[in-house]
Amino acid sequence: MIFAQEKLVDQGQGKWTVTIDGEQWIEFLKKAKNRLKANLVVPGFRKGKAPESETAKYLTPIKLYNEAFKIVIKPAFDFALTQENRIQNDNSPTPVIVKVSEKEIVIDFVFDLVLEVKIGEYKNISTIKKSTVEVSQEDVDNVIDMYRSRFAMQKEKEVSDQIQKGDIVTFDFKGYVDDQAFEGGEAKDFVLEIGSNQFVPGFEDSMIGLKVGENQEINVKFPEEYIPSLAGKDAKFVLNIKNIKEKILPAKDDELVKDLNLPDITTYVQLEEKVKKDVLEQKTKNNKSEFVENIIDEIIKTSEFQIPKTIVERQLKDVKKEFEDQLTQQKITLEKYKEITKISQEEIDEELKNDAIHRIKSFLVVSEIKNKENIKASEEAINTKFEEFANLYGIEVEKIKSLIDNQAIKHQVESELLETFIFENNGN
């Protein structure tokens, strides 16, 4: 027997190839022939007793080769297992006949490769720079305005009043391109907050200054990245503005703070300080996560991976499910998505597969770093995390422990430790 092997890395598979020829193959063919003859029933003869001249009519080469294949599989597989430095397999190999004749048989044993990573450098990577985080007054005002919106009042404007940014407008509209109404361009009693950017760029800005009344026109241009039938085209919308309401926000003062009833916050100055602190923490967290993701991408570039095809298929199934759920949530059909994005089904499939593979590679990289650096969550860190959740939800620690699995907390703590390790050991 002759042994050869090959890694099909792109497919996440490997194969052992065993060739049996010469006298050895002839012996297996003889065994196959004798086994077939012993069970062959030829009219006019007892089972297995027909002469060679008669059995030859029934024992075709295909039948003979198939029977010999059944006999030779085990010794061929056992021979492959004796080979030193053979590629390790992750599941039971599937035998496939590559070539067969009266002179030889060539069998491939195809299997999944063992999932593994040979990680590249994961410390002192300087190609990704750390950025500083700042909190502007606008950032603070935006958060406080969301608080104020909880207690906002609406006051109907006079018929003679103009629309201003922030107003709530009820109106009918109908859109035209080249003087032809288009699908999806019409609605009745639509309610819109001016400045919320629900419509295409320019639509809401064009409404500013209008008053209650019928047959008012505005002109917009659809973005280039839009439904192909409308992308980049000029459009006219005829509006019937029925009602304009002013959104009245409460003042930025201690009364607002009293209404919010936040723990340990009694003045507006304290509220601003808390918001600034919270925004800074969130921005810092997001900045850190983005930096770490970019570093992981750099590590992936210099690492070698061996990923079984079955694992890719399993991950791809999850990715496709997420994609389908997102479309459902956005109330968009797959066909409409392809029309909007101008990409084909083949491109979508390729993108989803690449996403699945990237997720697997990211998992392998972080798992390897975690193992190499012995990153583990201590009992103290786990208990501290439980206390954080208890404080967040305002319930007892023991109650939190009964609601959240200990392993889930352990995983979260270790993920945070790992993220901190990567952040502190890379970039400038």
Curated annotation (Swiss-Prot):
**Cited function:** Involved in protein export. Acts as a chaperone by maintaining the newly synthesized protein in an open conformation. Functions as a peptidyl-prolyl cis-trans isomerase.
Principal location: cytoplasm
Q: Report a single Gene Ontology molecular function.
A: peptidyl-prolyl cis-trans isomerase activity
Q: Reaction catalysed?
A: [protein]-peptidylproline (omega=180) = [protein]-peptidylproline (omega=0)
Q: One cellular component GO annotation, for this chain's record?
A: cytoplasm
The answer to whether keyword Isomerase applies is yes
Kindly give the HAMAP family that the UniProt entry links to this protein.
Trigger_factor_Tig
The family note in this entry says: Belongs to the FKBP-type PPIase family. Tig subfamily.
The UniProt entry, under Gene3D superfamilies, shows: 3.10.50.40, Trigger factor ribosome-binding domain, Trigger factor, C-terminal domain
Q: Which PROSITE patterns match?
A: FKBP_PPIASE (PS50059)
Enzyme Commission code: 5.2.1.8
What keywords does the record list, in alphabetical order?
Cell cycle, Cell division, Chaperone, Cytoplasm, Isomerase, Rotamase
Q: What range(s) does the PPIase FKBP-type domain occupy?
A: 166-250
* Entry's Gene Ontology BP terms: cell division; protein folding; protein transport
The residues forming the signal peptide are none
Enumerate the subcellular locations listed in this protein's record, separating them with semicolons.
Cytoplasm
- State the domain notes: Consists of 3 domains; the N-terminus binds the ribosome, the middle domain has PPIase activity, while the C-terminus has intrinsic chaperone activity on its own.
Domain of life, per UniProt, equals: Bacteria
Kindly provide the name given to this protein in its UniProt entry: Trigger factor
Pfam families in the cross-refs: FKBP_C, Trigger_C, Trigger_N
